[in-house]
Swiss-Prot record:
Species lineage: Eukaryota, Viridiplantae, Streptophyta, Embryophyta, Tracheophyta
Name of this protein: Expansin-A24
Record bears the keyword S-adenosyl-L-methionine: no
Alphabetical list of CDD domains matching this protein: DPBB_EXPA_N
Species, as recorded: Arabidopsis thaliana
Keywords assigned: Cell wall, Cell wall biogenesis/degradation, Membrane, Repeat, Secreted, Signal
Residue span of region Disordered: 31-86
Length: 312
């Protein structure tokens, strides 16, 4: 009888141990699959819809072969021309036009460019409002512009322009002048405006983004001023388009930092007559390029232009 009691007690003890140990074992096994454990096979990693093949990436209808974009501006490795300048994100503003159908009144301008046709900019230009012009630092920058939110006035497609002028504010008209800060406004040449909107619209809402400048040929350098106050205008600049720093070097000198005079005209008081001139440009995205012995030693300060042969 005593033996039977001991066997029964042993069975009960074993059952209690099984019941007590089993949950601990199962709990430990589960811990290898929670987010704090090995992430490999966890449903929140790997093929989770928020990663990898997320519907907003890859083959999303608004990306890839979109007629007006190429790759979406909010993603990393985007196509560029002449450098590694990415497309920026879309901003929103307005656009008007100035001048006539032939681009009259759009030549020259606050960036210091001259004959825009000869310099390669043509009619694909715009004057920027104060908020965009940024004291001339955006001269030469390129933008893609699309009309939006006005189906009765907007035309499909987009245009690409180079910033060549400044649209000044008029504080006597605080409510009617589109170029007053902080408004982001493009005053386009008339032919470019008519590519995205109807003439009678006058002013339309637009979305815009900074894009790489695709230019034909090398960067050009125009020499102005006088031997004691040399002024250089770099134009037809690809890549970021806008120049943020410039240096000059004569045959017998080291690199000399130039000061921005106005627009995209840079100056130095160092006399460099009788020397071949080389230039070093840094664009607004930080890319630097050298243009060696661009001029012969007998250059003149009379508006001569010289081809740097290469571009960004």
């Amino acid at each position: 009888m005593e033996l039977l009691k001991r066997k029964l007690y042993a069975k009960i003890l074993m059952m209690v141990m099984v019941i007590w140990i089993a949950p601990m074992t199962n709990g430990h096994d589960h811990a290898s699959h929670v987010p704090g454990g090995r992430p490999g096979a966890h449903p929140s990693h790997g093929a989770h819809p928020a990663h990898g093949a997320h519907p907003s990436h890859g083959a999303h209808p608004s990306h890839g072969a979109h007629p007006s974009h190429g790759a979406h501006p909010s993603h990393g490795a985007l196509p560029s021309h002449g450098g590694q300048v990415p497309h920026s994100g879309w901003g929103h503003g307005r656009a008007t036009f100035y001048g006539d159908i032939n681009g009259g009144e759009t030549q020259q301008g606050a960036c210091g460019y001259g004959d825009l046709h000869k310099q390669g900019y043509g009619l694909e230009t715009a004057a920027l409002s104060t908020a965009l012009f940024n004291n001339g630092s955006r001269c030469g920058a390129c933008y893609e512009i699309m009309c939006e939110h006005a189906p009765q006035w907007c035309l499909p497609g987009s245009i690409k322009i180079t910033a060549t002028n400044f649209c000044p504010p008029d504080f006597t008209k605080p409510n009617d002048n589109w170029c007053n800060p902080p408004q982001k406004h493009f005053d386009l040449s008339q032919p470019m405006f008519l590519k995205i909107a109807k003439y009678k619209a006058g002013v339309v809402p637009v979305k815009f983004r900074r894009v790489p400048c695709a230019k034909i040929g090398g960067v050009k350098f125009e020499i102005k001023g006088n031997p004691h106050f040399l002024m250089i205008l770099p134009y037809n600049v690809g890549g970021a388009g806008a120049v943020r720093a410039m240096q000059i070097k004569g045959t017998r000198t080291q690199w000399i930092a130039m000061k921005k005079n106005w627009g995209q005209i840079w100056s130095t008081g160092v006399v460099l007559t009788g020397q071949c001139l080389s230039f070093r440009l840094t664009t607004s995205d930080g890319v630097m390029k050298e243009f060696i012995d661009v001029t012969p030693p007998d250059w003149k300060c009379n508006g001569q232009s010289f081809d740097g042969k290469v571009n960004f």
